């Protein structure tokens, strides 16, 4: 009987130990399940965090791409700005060189214009002088021509008087009633008129020579006037084409 009690007691003890082990195992399983649940929750949270990080990474990559594109655009604009600045510098240098060239050309044109104006003034004075000489020569030729015409009339009159005196002298020499004094007086008048006629002829020749000289001088004055006018027209044409 005691053996049975001992055996039952041993079995009870084993049963209690088994129950305890089962309880411990259950507790451990519960703890493990709780830990697994916590781990799963943590995994979910980590998964969510990872997804958020991936979204943030995508957003960051998108922003980086946008910033890269913007940087490239800004760099392109900066390069264009540097190129434009360089072109402006080159253009500025070109414009400066062109300005210097234009200033030099302007100075040359101004100097040429001053020379032309001075030459124009000289030609104008020369033209006025030639006009004055031409007027004087024309007046002189007109006066000489009038004197020649007057002498021609005078020569004709003296010739007529000489012929009349010769006729009277012939009549006087044929008339027996003419006195010697009247003959001498007639001869003296004849000589006076003849001298006057000779003088008129000499003066006529001188005036004709002077008239010829005057014509030559008038032609020379007209030629000089024409040349001065041609020079003036040519200079004005050059001045207009500048």
Curated annotation (Swiss-Prot):
Tissue note: Expressed ubiquitously.
- Coiled coil feature spans: 1-242
| Comp. bias regions, Basic and acidic residues | 13-23, 70-96
* Segments passing through the bilayer: none
- The name of this protein is Tropomyosin-1
Print the domain comment field. Answer: The molecule is in a coiled coil structure that is formed by 2 polypeptide chains. The sequence exhibits a prominent seven-residues periodicity.
Quaternary assembly = Homodimer.
Give the gene name.
TPM1
Q: Which InterPro entries match?
A: Tropomyosin
Q: Where is this region: Disordered?
A: 1-31, 65-96
The similarity comment for this entry is:
Belongs to the tropomyosin family.
Keywords on this record?
Coiled coil, Repeat
Source organism of the structure: Podocoryna carnea (Hydrozoan)
């Amino acid at each position: 009987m005691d053996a049975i009690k001992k055996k039952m007691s041993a079995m009870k003890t084993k049963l209690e130990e088994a129950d305890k082990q089962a309880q411990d195992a259950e507790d451990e399983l519960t703890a493990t399940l709780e830990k697994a649940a916590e781990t799963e929750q943590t995994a979910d949270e980590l998964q969510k965090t990872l997804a958020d990080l991936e979204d943030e990474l995508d957003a960051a990559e998108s922003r980086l791409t946008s910033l890269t594109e913007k940087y490239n655009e800004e760099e392109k604009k900066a390069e264009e700005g540097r190129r434009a600045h360089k072109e402006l510098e080159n253009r500025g240098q070109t414009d400066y060189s062109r300005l210097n060239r234009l200033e030099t050309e302007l100075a040359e044109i101004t100097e040429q214009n001053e020379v032309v104006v001075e030459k124009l003034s000289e030609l104008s004075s020369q033209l006025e002088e030639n006009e004055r000489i031409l007027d004087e020569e024309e007046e002189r030729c007109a006066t000489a021509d009038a004197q020649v015409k007057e002498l021609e009339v005078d020569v004709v009159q003296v010739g007529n008087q000489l012929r009349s005196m010769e006729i009277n002298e012939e009549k006087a020499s044929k008339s027996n009633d003419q006195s010697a004094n009247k003959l001498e007086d007639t001869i003296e008048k004849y000589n006076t008129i003849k001298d006057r006629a000779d003088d008129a002829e000499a003066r006529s020749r001188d005036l004709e020579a002077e008239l010829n000289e005057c014509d030559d001088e008038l032609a020379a004055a007209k030629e000089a006037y024409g040349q001065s006018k041609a020079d003036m027209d040519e200079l004005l044409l050059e001045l207009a084409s500048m």
